[in-house]
């Protein structure tokens, strides 16, 4: 790997230098060839294993943990930082640079009495979801590899330590800006320095002046809205949408007790530590705006409040338009050249009525959408109908859907298009759990198979049909803990 060190050299007050503590008897558990290509790597080598497990220095790496703060479950925590993630620098790839971070690399000055380690199950889950979201076309950070070990760590019980090697276009979070506004009061110079660095590095088309700052914040608002619209369309619940887990670039970031929906449930909670459902699936769009409001509050020393409010008011439109684009594609509705407010309203009602029917009839979210690839929309009798207990309500919806759909002349092409946007395979929690259990038993084959299948989620892959089935009773709607 070839590194540059722009963050390290230009923002010395934004991190602490710290070196990883090596895993004992490291071994490759997973490797993403797609992600490796981003930074010019090809194969997982023994030399690379030693370096990424913290047992040998990597040429050009600097090793540091970033400092930031954030709102966690609505309350402000003045000092957080990378408690177990150590960044090596920005690896230069054929199409840009990517931060390389060792998540689980050992304690840092921000570990808050923690051991700085990640357990194997959380490392595998983060790897799988990073790559699964990417192949579902959801904006996300990436995962290069998982490295296992025989090092014991204690959570609820004894487990083994592992490292997820994360790739990110940037690790700058909403919480970085909050830290230098709230926790380091009087450091508006550092806030401005961070803002100028972010624009120069990631928005080079913008200027570092008042007009550029406003244009940048608008881009952040729009990118965040688009990311969350993708989550809602694909049925993804993040679980811990604290502001320190929000990427400034609008990439899905810092995965913990996440879940993809099995049965559609608007108020689904995937996080055992969120009994009130602050971060429930249906709450995510509102939380996204709340988090952006906290970011805006931190930016008041450099951007006038009236401008920030005006930009925040554009969040809903960006969210709705992206959501409509994605959901119209799932339904096969014509994307209008000039969408009117009335048409948008009608389409949102049509989509909302269908998801309400899915919830009332306890239908599987992914499987139901996938059936549109077998649907003949010209037929008066939908093949979907048998899945609904209340067939009368479905018939009413289906008539409205057919009216909005209009004439479909090439049925085969229409069905192929539906299969290209409605995945057959998603990362169901029970599938991840089965792969983790197999890894604990020394068998990597189920993990490798699951990774391979999730890299082609829209393909039929009939030999893997069982991975597309609804979960067994024990695996339905699993709620995960934040323990990692």
Curated annotation (Swiss-Prot):
MF term (GO), any:
ATP binding
Describe the function of this protein. Nucleotidyltransferase involved in the post-translational modification of proteins. It can catalyze the addition of adenosine monophosphate (AMP) or uridine monophosphate (UMP) to a protein, resulting in modifications known as AMPylation and UMPylation.
InterPro entries (alphabetical): SelO
Broad enzyme group? transferase
Q: What reaction is this protein's catalytic activity?
A: L-seryl-[protein] + ATP = 3-O-(5'-adenylyl)-L-seryl-[protein] + diphosphate; L-threonyl-[protein] + ATP = 3-O-(5'-adenylyl)-L-threonyl-[protein] + diphosphate; L-tyrosyl-[protein] + ATP = O-(5'-adenylyl)-L-tyrosyl-[protein] + diphosphate; L-histidyl-[protein] + UTP = N(tele)-(5'-uridylyl)-L-histidyl-[protein] + diphosphate
Enzyme Commission no: 2.7.7.-, 2.7.7.108
**UniProt-recorded name of the protein:** Protein nucleotidyltransferase YdiU
Keyword annotations for this protein, in alphabetical order, are: ATP-binding, Magnesium, Manganese, Metal-binding, Nucleotide-binding, Nucleotidyltransferase, Transferase
Q: Which residues bind Mg(2+)?
A: 245, 254
